[in-house]
Amino acid sequence: MAVSDLLNRRVRALPDEDEELYSEASVSELESNDEEVEGSGSDISDDSSEGDYSSDSQDESDAMSHENEEEDDEDDENSDDGQDDVQASLSNISFGALAKAQASLGPTAKRKSKATQSKTDDGETPAASPLDDIRARIREAREQKREGSSKSKDLEKFSRSSKHAPMVQSSKHPVTRKRTIIEPPAALKSRDPRFDPAVRSQSGRSEASQSAYAFLDDYRAAELKEMKEKLAKTKDPRQKEALKRDIRSATDRLRTIENRRREKEVLAEHKKREKELIREGKKSTPYFLKKSELKKQALLKKYESMGSRQRVKALERRQKKLTAKERKEMPMERRGLGNDPTPYNDGGGGKRRRLA
Protein backbone atom coordinates (compact mmCIF):
# COMPACT_ATOMS: atom_id res chain seq x y z
CA MET A 1 0.00 0.00 0.00
CA ALA A 2 2.82 2.40 0.78
CA VAL A 3 4.52 1.97 -2.63
CA SER A 4 1.29 2.55 -4.53
CA ASP A 5 0.61 5.65 -2.51
CA LEU A 6 4.06 7.01 -3.38
CA LEU A 7 3.58 6.33 -7.08
CA ASN A 8 0.14 7.91 -7.14
CA ARG A 9 1.26 11.06 -5.37
CA ARG A 10 0.43 14.24 -7.32
CA VAL A 11 3.42 16.32 -8.39
CA ARG A 12 3.05 19.65 -10.23
CA ALA A 13 5.77 21.08 -12.50
CA LEU A 14 6.65 24.67 -11.77
CA PRO A 15 7.50 27.16 -14.59
CA ASP A 16 11.23 27.83 -15.15
CA GLU A 17 10.75 31.61 -15.51
CA ASP A 18 9.38 32.00 -11.98
CA GLU A 19 12.03 30.08 -10.03
CA GLU A 20 13.34 33.23 -8.38
CA LEU A 21 9.87 34.10 -7.10
CA TYR A 22 9.73 31.18 -4.66
CA SER A 23 10.67 31.82 -1.06
CA GLU A 24 13.41 29.99 0.87
CA ALA A 25 10.86 28.49 3.24
CA SER A 26 9.07 26.71 0.43
CA VAL A 27 12.40 25.36 -0.89
CA SER A 28 13.37 24.02 2.57
CA GLU A 29 9.95 22.39 2.95
CA LEU A 30 10.33 20.69 -0.42
CA GLU A 31 13.78 19.37 0.55
CA SER A 32 12.48 18.03 3.86
CA ASN A 33 9.63 16.32 2.06
CA ASP A 34 12.06 14.70 -0.35
CA GLU A 35 14.20 13.44 2.52
CA GLU A 36 11.18 11.97 4.26
CA VAL A 37 10.10 10.30 1.03
CA GLU A 38 13.57 8.82 0.62
CA GLY A 39 13.56 7.63 4.24
CA SER A 40 10.21 5.98 3.81
CA GLY A 41 11.38 4.35 0.64
CA SER A 42 14.46 2.93 2.37
CA ASP A 43 12.34 1.59 5.24
CA ILE A 44 10.00 -0.06 2.80
CA SER A 45 12.91 -1.64 0.97
CA ASP A 46 14.38 -2.91 4.24
CA ASP A 47 11.07 -4.40 5.24
CA SER A 48 10.68 -6.07 1.91
CA SER A 49 14.21 -7.48 2.02
CA GLU A 50 13.79 -8.88 5.48
CA GLY A 51 10.39 -10.38 4.61
CA ASP A 52 8.85 -9.72 7.99
CA TYR A 53 5.12 -9.21 7.64
CA SER A 54 4.45 -8.45 11.22
CA SER A 55 1.69 -6.34 12.53
CA ASP A 56 4.17 -3.74 13.69
CA SER A 57 5.37 -3.04 10.16
CA GLN A 58 1.79 -2.70 8.96
CA ASP A 59 1.07 -0.16 11.65
CA GLU A 60 4.13 1.80 10.65
CA SER A 61 3.15 1.76 7.00
CA ASP A 62 -0.33 2.98 7.87
CA ALA A 63 1.15 5.83 9.83
CA MET A 64 3.46 6.71 6.96
CA SER A 65 0.57 6.74 4.51
CA HIS A 66 -1.32 9.16 6.72
CA GLU A 67 1.73 11.37 6.92
CA ASN A 68 2.14 11.30 3.11
CA GLU A 69 -1.47 12.36 2.63
CA GLU A 70 -0.95 15.28 4.97
CA GLU A 71 2.22 16.25 3.08
CA ASP A 72 0.29 16.16 -0.24
CA ASP A 73 -2.29 18.55 1.16
CA GLU A 74 0.48 20.89 2.29
CA ASP A 75 2.09 20.70 -1.19
CA ASP A 76 -1.21 21.65 -2.83
CA GLU A 77 -1.58 24.63 -0.53
CA ASN A 78 2.03 25.71 -1.24
CA SER A 79 1.51 25.42 -5.00
CA ASP A 80 -1.66 27.55 -4.82
CA ASP A 81 0.26 30.19 -2.87
CA GLY A 82 3.04 30.09 -5.49
CA GLN A 83 0.58 30.66 -8.33
CA ASP A 84 -0.90 33.63 -6.50
CA ASP A 85 2.61 35.05 -6.09
CA VAL A 86 3.28 34.59 -9.85
CA GLN A 87 0.06 36.35 -10.85
CA ALA A 88 0.83 39.26 -8.50
CA SER A 89 4.36 39.61 -9.88
CA LEU A 90 3.12 39.50 -13.51
CA SER A 91 0.61 42.25 -12.80
CA ASN A 92 3.47 44.46 -11.53
CA ILE A 93 5.69 44.00 -14.64
CA SER A 94 5.85 47.12 -16.87
CA PHE A 95 4.96 47.17 -20.60
CA GLY A 96 8.50 48.23 -21.49
CA ALA A 97 9.92 45.06 -19.96
CA LEU A 98 7.37 42.96 -21.86
CA ALA A 99 8.24 44.71 -25.14
CA LYS A 100 11.97 44.08 -24.61
CA ALA A 101 11.29 40.43 -23.88
CA GLN A 102 9.18 40.08 -27.03
CA ALA A 103 11.86 41.84 -29.13
CA SER A 104 14.51 39.48 -27.76
CA LEU A 105 12.40 36.49 -28.76
CA GLY A 106 11.89 37.88 -32.30
CA PRO A 107 8.79 37.96 -34.56
CA THR A 108 6.41 35.06 -34.80
CA ALA A 109 7.38 34.23 -38.39
CA LYS A 110 11.04 33.83 -37.41
CA ARG A 111 10.10 31.74 -34.40
CA LYS A 112 7.95 29.49 -36.56
CA SER A 113 10.73 29.16 -39.14
CA LYS A 114 13.19 28.30 -36.35
CA ALA A 115 10.77 25.72 -35.00
CA THR A 116 10.39 24.13 -38.43
CA GLN A 117 14.17 24.14 -38.90
CA SER A 118 14.62 22.44 -35.54
CA LYS A 119 12.08 19.83 -36.53
CA THR A 120 13.87 19.19 -39.82
CA ASP A 121 17.17 18.99 -37.97
CA ASP A 122 15.70 16.42 -35.63
CA GLY A 123 14.70 14.36 -38.63
CA GLU A 124 11.00 15.14 -38.74
CA THR A 125 9.93 16.09 -42.31
CA PRO A 126 6.93 18.48 -42.31
CA ALA A 127 4.02 17.43 -44.50
CA ALA A 128 3.71 19.72 -47.57
CA SER A 129 0.11 20.89 -48.00
CA PRO A 130 -1.36 22.25 -51.31
CA LEU A 131 -2.32 25.48 -49.55
CA ASP A 132 1.34 26.21 -48.83
CA ASP A 133 2.21 25.70 -52.51
CA ILE A 134 -0.57 28.05 -53.62
CA ARG A 135 0.54 30.68 -51.13
CA ALA A 136 4.13 30.41 -52.34
CA ARG A 137 3.02 30.87 -55.97
CA ILE A 138 0.90 33.89 -55.09
CA ARG A 139 3.83 35.39 -53.19
CA GLU A 140 6.14 34.89 -56.19
CA ALA A 141 3.60 36.44 -58.58
CA ARG A 142 3.25 39.49 -56.34
CA GLU A 143 7.00 39.93 -56.18
CA GLN A 144 7.28 39.72 -59.99
CA LYS A 145 4.49 42.25 -60.38
CA ARG A 146 6.17 44.65 -57.99
CA GLU A 147 9.46 44.33 -59.86
CA GLY A 148 7.74 44.97 -63.21
CA SER A 149 5.87 48.02 -61.88
CA SER A 150 9.07 49.45 -60.42
CA LYS A 151 10.85 48.97 -63.77
CA SER A 152 7.98 50.61 -65.69
CA LYS A 153 8.02 53.56 -63.30
CA ASP A 154 11.73 53.97 -63.84
CA LEU A 155 11.22 53.96 -67.61
CA GLU A 156 8.36 56.49 -67.44
CA LYS A 157 10.54 59.09 -65.77
CA PHE A 158 11.36 61.40 -68.69
CA SER A 159 14.01 64.06 -68.62
CA ARG A 160 14.87 66.92 -70.94
CA SER A 161 18.26 67.23 -72.55
CA SER A 162 18.30 70.94 -71.73
CA LYS A 163 16.02 73.56 -70.27
CA HIS A 164 15.27 74.90 -73.77
CA ALA A 165 14.23 71.51 -75.12
CA PRO A 166 10.54 70.63 -75.22
CA MET A 167 9.18 68.49 -72.45
CA VAL A 168 8.84 64.80 -73.24
CA GLN A 169 5.47 63.41 -72.29
CA SER A 170 3.89 60.03 -72.83
CA SER A 171 1.07 59.80 -75.36
CA LYS A 172 -0.62 57.01 -73.42
CA HIS A 173 -3.45 58.36 -71.30
CA PRO A 174 -5.89 56.23 -69.33
CA VAL A 175 -9.36 55.94 -70.74
CA THR A 176 -11.90 57.84 -68.69
CA ARG A 177 -14.30 55.74 -66.66
CA LYS A 178 -17.14 58.22 -67.12
CA ARG A 179 -19.72 57.50 -69.78
CA THR A 180 -22.23 59.92 -71.26
CA ILE A 181 -25.43 57.90 -71.08
CA ILE A 182 -27.71 60.84 -71.86
CA GLU A 183 -26.40 63.70 -73.97
CA PRO A 184 -27.17 67.09 -72.43
CA PRO A 185 -29.23 69.43 -74.59
CA ALA A 186 -27.16 71.74 -76.74
CA ALA A 187 -27.07 75.36 -75.67
CA LEU A 188 -29.10 77.67 -77.84
CA LYS A 189 -26.93 79.97 -79.94
CA SER A 190 -28.22 83.24 -81.30
CA ARG A 191 -27.71 83.59 -85.03
CA ASP A 192 -28.13 86.37 -87.55
CA PRO A 193 -30.19 85.29 -90.58
CA ARG A 194 -28.26 87.69 -92.80
CA PHE A 195 -25.10 85.64 -92.32
CA ASP A 196 -26.73 82.24 -92.01
CA PRO A 197 -25.50 79.93 -94.80
CA ALA A 198 -28.86 78.14 -94.83
CA VAL A 199 -30.49 81.42 -95.78
CA ARG A 200 -27.82 82.91 -98.02
CA SER A 201 -26.88 79.83 -100.04
CA GLN A 202 -28.88 79.03 -103.14
CA SER A 203 -29.25 75.35 -102.30
CA GLY A 204 -30.61 76.18 -98.88
CA ARG A 205 -33.13 78.78 -100.06
CA SER A 206 -36.17 76.56 -100.19
CA GLU A 207 -39.73 77.79 -100.32
CA ALA A 208 -40.09 77.47 -96.56
CA SER A 209 -36.93 79.47 -95.84
CA GLN A 210 -37.90 82.14 -98.37
CA SER A 211 -41.28 82.62 -96.78
CA ALA A 212 -39.77 82.57 -93.27
CA TYR A 213 -37.04 85.13 -94.04
CA ALA A 214 -38.84 87.29 -96.58
CA PHE A 215 -38.62 90.27 -94.22
CA LEU A 216 -34.83 90.40 -94.74
CA ASP A 217 -35.28 91.84 -98.22
CA ASP A 218 -37.16 94.78 -96.71
CA TYR A 219 -34.37 95.26 -94.16
CA ARG A 220 -31.75 95.27 -96.91
CA ALA A 221 -33.67 97.85 -98.91
CA ALA A 222 -34.05 100.10 -95.84
CA GLU A 223 -30.35 99.72 -95.05
CA LEU A 224 -29.42 100.70 -98.60
CA LYS A 225 -31.61 103.79 -98.36
CA GLU A 226 -29.96 104.87 -95.10
CA MET A 227 -26.48 104.46 -96.59
CA LYS A 228 -27.43 106.66 -99.56
CA GLU A 229 -28.68 109.36 -97.20
CA LYS A 230 -25.41 109.22 -95.21
CA LEU A 231 -23.42 109.49 -98.44
CA ALA A 232 -25.28 112.67 -99.35
CA LYS A 233 -24.62 114.25 -95.94
CA THR A 234 -20.99 113.27 -95.27
CA LYS A 235 -18.06 115.41 -96.45
CA ASP A 236 -15.18 113.18 -95.38
CA PRO A 237 -13.67 111.56 -98.51
CA ARG A 238 -12.70 108.37 -96.65
CA GLN A 239 -16.20 107.86 -95.32
CA LYS A 240 -17.60 108.59 -98.78
CA GLU A 241 -15.42 105.91 -100.34
CA ALA A 242 -16.42 103.42 -97.65
CA LEU A 243 -20.11 104.24 -98.08
CA LYS A 244 -19.86 103.95 -101.87
CA ARG A 245 -18.28 100.54 -101.51
CA ASP A 246 -21.00 99.39 -99.10
CA ILE A 247 -23.75 100.76 -101.34
CA ARG A 248 -22.29 98.98 -104.35
CA SER A 249 -22.13 95.64 -102.53
CA ALA A 250 -25.67 96.07 -101.18
CA THR A 251 -27.10 96.89 -104.63
CA ASP A 252 -25.29 93.92 -106.17
CA ARG A 253 -26.68 91.65 -103.45
CA LEU A 254 -30.22 92.90 -104.04
CA ARG A 255 -29.82 92.56 -107.81
CA THR A 256 -28.59 88.98 -107.43
CA ILE A 257 -31.51 88.09 -105.17
CA GLU A 258 -33.94 89.63 -107.66
CA ASN A 259 -32.40 87.77 -110.60
CA ARG A 260 -32.61 84.45 -108.74
CA ARG A 261 -36.24 85.08 -107.88
CA ARG A 262 -37.00 85.95 -111.52
CA GLU A 263 -35.23 82.82 -112.79
CA LYS A 264 -37.23 80.65 -110.40
CA GLU A 265 -40.45 82.21 -111.65
CA VAL A 266 -39.45 81.57 -115.27
CA LEU A 267 -38.52 77.97 -114.48
CA ALA A 268 -41.79 77.36 -112.63
CA GLU A 269 -43.78 78.77 -115.60
CA HIS A 270 -41.85 76.60 -118.05
CA LYS A 271 -42.47 73.43 -115.99
CA LYS A 272 -46.15 74.25 -115.72
CA ARG A 273 -46.40 74.78 -119.50
CA GLU A 274 -44.61 71.52 -120.26
CA LYS A 275 -46.91 69.57 -117.91
CA GLU A 276 -49.99 70.99 -119.64
CA LEU A 277 -48.63 70.01 -123.07
CA ILE A 278 -47.92 66.47 -121.87
CA ARG A 279 -51.37 66.23 -120.30
CA GLU A 280 -52.95 67.36 -123.60
CA GLY A 281 -50.91 64.81 -125.53
CA LYS A 282 -48.98 67.25 -127.64
CA LYS A 283 -45.66 66.11 -126.11
CA SER A 284 -44.45 62.78 -124.88
CA THR A 285 -41.30 64.00 -123.07
CA PRO A 286 -40.76 67.36 -121.35
CA TYR A 287 -38.16 69.85 -122.51
CA PHE A 288 -35.66 71.05 -119.89
CA LEU A 289 -34.29 74.57 -120.21
CA LYS A 290 -30.57 75.18 -120.39
CA LYS A 291 -28.93 77.74 -118.12
CA SER A 292 -28.26 80.11 -121.03
CA GLU A 293 -31.90 79.93 -122.20
CA LEU A 294 -33.08 80.44 -118.62
CA LYS A 295 -30.96 83.59 -118.31
CA LYS A 296 -32.27 84.96 -121.63
CA GLN A 297 -35.90 84.44 -120.65
CA ALA A 298 -35.25 85.99 -117.21
CA LEU A 299 -33.64 89.02 -118.91
CA LEU A 300 -36.62 89.42 -121.28
CA LYS A 301 -38.96 89.30 -118.32
CA LYS A 302 -36.87 91.95 -116.59
CA TYR A 303 -37.07 94.32 -119.55
CA GLU A 304 -40.81 93.74 -119.92
CA SER A 305 -41.39 94.78 -116.31
CA MET A 306 -39.44 98.07 -116.82
CA GLY A 307 -40.74 101.39 -118.08
CA SER A 308 -39.77 102.89 -121.44
CA ARG A 309 -37.03 105.18 -120.15
CA GLN A 310 -35.61 102.58 -117.76
CA ARG A 311 -35.57 100.07 -120.59
CA VAL A 312 -33.61 102.44 -122.87
CA LYS A 313 -31.03 103.18 -120.18
CA ALA A 314 -30.67 99.50 -119.34
CA LEU A 315 -30.17 98.61 -123.00
CA GLU A 316 -27.52 101.33 -123.40
CA ARG A 317 -25.62 100.07 -120.36
CA ARG A 318 -25.82 96.53 -121.66
CA GLN A 319 -24.57 97.57 -125.09
CA LYS A 320 -21.55 99.35 -123.57
CA LYS A 321 -20.78 96.30 -121.47
CA LEU A 322 -20.88 93.99 -124.49
CA THR A 323 -18.69 96.29 -126.64
CA ALA A 324 -16.07 96.53 -123.87
CA LYS A 325 -16.06 92.76 -123.61
CA GLU A 326 -15.65 92.34 -127.38
CA ARG A 327 -12.87 94.93 -127.47
CA LYS A 328 -10.90 92.99 -124.84
CA GLU A 329 -11.14 89.86 -126.97
CA MET A 330 -10.18 91.78 -130.15
CA PRO A 331 -6.51 91.73 -131.37
CA MET A 332 -4.33 94.78 -130.74
CA GLU A 333 -4.19 95.86 -134.45
CA ARG A 334 -7.97 96.03 -134.79
CA ARG A 335 -8.51 98.11 -131.68
CA GLY A 336 -7.11 101.35 -133.18
CA LEU A 337 -8.92 103.82 -135.45
CA GLY A 338 -7.55 104.26 -139.01
CA ASN A 339 -3.73 104.21 -139.34
CA ASP A 340 -2.98 105.44 -135.81
CA PRO A 341 0.12 103.53 -134.66
CA THR A 342 -0.70 103.94 -130.96
CA PRO A 343 -2.27 100.69 -129.78
CA TYR A 344 -4.05 102.29 -126.81
CA ASN A 345 -5.70 105.25 -128.59
CA ASP A 346 -9.14 104.19 -127.41
CA GLY A 347 -8.12 104.64 -123.80
CA GLY A 348 -9.06 101.10 -122.82
CA GLY A 349 -6.66 98.49 -121.59
CA GLY A 350 -6.38 95.07 -123.10
CA LYS A 351 -4.24 92.04 -123.63
CA ARG A 352 -0.94 92.48 -125.43
CA ARG A 353 -0.24 90.30 -128.41
CA ARG A 354 3.12 88.64 -128.60
CA LEU A 355 5.18 89.24 -131.70
CA ALA A 356 6.25 86.15 -133.59
Swiss-Prot record:
Keywords attached to this entry: Coiled coil, Nucleus, Ribonucleoprotein, Ribosome biogenesis, rRNA processing
Sequence ranges of Acidic residues compositional bias: 31-50, 57-84
Biological process terms in GO annotation: maturation of SSU-rRNA from tricistronic rRNA transcript (SSU-rRNA, 5.8S rRNA, LSU-rRNA)
Region spans: Disordered: 14-209, 305-356
Compositionally biased tracts (Polar residues): 200-209
Coiled coil: 238-280
Source species, domain of life: Eukaryota
Pfam families: RRP36
Basic and acidic residues bias spans: 132-159, 313-337
Main location: nucleus
Subcellular location as annotated: Nucleus, Nucleolus
One cellular-component annotation, GO: nucleolus
Function: Component of the 90S pre-ribosome involved in the maturation of rRNAs. Required for early cleavages of the pre-RNAs in the 40S ribosomal subunit maturation pathway.
Subunit composition and interactions: Associates with 90S and pre-40S pre-ribosomal particles.
Family according to the record: Belongs to the RRP36 family.
The protein's name in its UniProt record: rRNA biogenesis protein rrp36
Native source species: Aspergillus fumigatus (strain ATCC MYA-4609 / CBS 101355 / FGSC A1100 / Af293) (Neosartorya fumigata)
